[in-house]
């Protein structure tokens, strides 16, 4: 009975990932022809969300497989079962940081308007730091299940700078109305503004290799788990082909990766025409994605 239940869950996950890959491919097509900075930022965020949701489902698939292999009493077909709830683990959530300059005498809470609604749920003193750290979560965490959080702390070196650490992407209704995850204010007069969600579009290949090691160790049985072995190429191609578009701020995850990207922001004279998105075609891995390819084991997605 347990095996039949697991097969049904695998099939559901396969369909969800298939839809996310098609969605990401469509956004990538639009990104290649987008002419404005604002549109590219919005599409980049959508592409990232497709990646993040796919990884979240696959991370959950490993946990589900471990539970099913761990034994336990079998359930009858007519027994009441809780609906499948897929929740992101902290290790799978993207994380990035920013420094924002504030006006002299301004309060911390009044200068944190980044387009999203946050609720402060805690504050504590940090050992060795001059200023306390504030903890915020999305206002819609309970009503819509949004897991986005951030931490805010004044810089010890410069009281006019706020160090902000973000974790997770907004999945609430706010995300559709806000074009970027956070505004990064200029720290230098001639510095071009860059937005945090663009810094996150690329994941380090080491991240996927680490995930592959974890998933392969689970030894999925082919009879009960779908295979995404062909999809790894899409992740790696996105990283290799588009790395020139993004960067100069760092992105890191709890898996231990930290990488830099170079994004040629519009209006910056320091970037040559050869680096401009208008002259360099975007070849997205989503373009070659086949939604009808065969499936086998989830571990193959990272192999």
UniProtKB/Swiss-Prot annotation:
The lineage of its organism: Eukaryota, Viridiplantae, Streptophyta, Embryophyta, Tracheophyta. InterPro entries: WRKY_dom (IPR003657), WRKY_dom_sf (IPR036576), WRKY_plant (IPR044810). Transcription factor. Interacts specifically with the W box (5'-(T)TGAC[CT]-3'), a frequently occurring elicitor-responsive cis-acting element. Belongs to the WRKY group III family. GO terms for molecular function: DNA-binding transcription factor activity; sequence-specific DNA binding. Keywords: DNA-binding, Nucleus, Transcription, Transcription regulation. It holds the Pfam family WRKY. Coiled coil: none annotated. One of its GO terms (biological process) is response to ozone. Residues 65-92, 266-291 are annotated as: Disordered. Residues 107-175 bind DNA. Induction: By salicylic acid (SA). It is found in: Nucleus. Interacts with WRKY53, WRKY54 and WRKY70. It comes from Arabidopsis thaliana (Mouse-ear cress). PANTHER family: WRKY TRANSCRIPTION FACTOR 30-RELATED, WRKY TRANSCRIPTION FACTOR 30-RELATED-RELATED. This is Probable WRKY transcription factor 30. Transmembrane segments: none annotated. Its main location: nucleus.
């Amino acid at each position: 009975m347990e095996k039949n239940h697991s097969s049904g869950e695998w099939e559901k996950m396969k369909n969800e990932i298939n839809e996310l890959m098609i969605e990401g491919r469509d956004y990538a097509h639009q990104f290649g022809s987008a002419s404005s900075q604002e549109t590219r930022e919005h599409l980049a965020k959508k592409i990232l969300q497709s990646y993040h949701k796919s990884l979240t489902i696959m991370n959950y698939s490993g946990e589900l497989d471990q539970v099913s292999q761990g034994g336990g009493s079998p359930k009858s077909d007519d027994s009441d079962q809780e609906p499948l709830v897929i929740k992101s683990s902290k290790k799978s959530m993207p994380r990035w940081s920013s420094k924002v300059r504030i006006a002299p005498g301004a309060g911390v809470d009044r200068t944190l308007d980044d387009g999203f609604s946050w609720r402060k749920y805690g504050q504590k003193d940090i050992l060795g730091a001059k200023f306390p750290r504030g903890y915020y979560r999305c206002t819609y965490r309970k009503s819509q299940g949004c897991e986005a959080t951030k931490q805010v702390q004044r810089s010890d070196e410069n009281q006019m700078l706020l160090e902000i650490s973000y974790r997770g992407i907004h999945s609430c209704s706010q995300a559709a109305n806000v074009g970027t995850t956070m505004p990064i204010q200029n720290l230098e007069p001639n510095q071009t503004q860059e937005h945090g969600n663009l810094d996150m579009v690329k994941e380090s290949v080491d991240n996927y290799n680490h995930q592959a090691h974890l998933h392969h160790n689970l030894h999925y049985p082919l009879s009960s788990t779908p295979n995404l072995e062909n999809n790894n190429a899409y992740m790696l191609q996105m990283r290799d082909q588009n790395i020139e578009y993004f960067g100069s701020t760092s992105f890191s995850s709890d898996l231990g990766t930290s990488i830099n990207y170079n994004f040629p922001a519009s209006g910056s004279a320091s970037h040559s025409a050869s680096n401009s998105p208008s002259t360099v075609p975007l070849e997205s891995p989503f373009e070659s994605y086949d939604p009808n390819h065969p499936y086998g084991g989830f571990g193959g997605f990272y192999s």
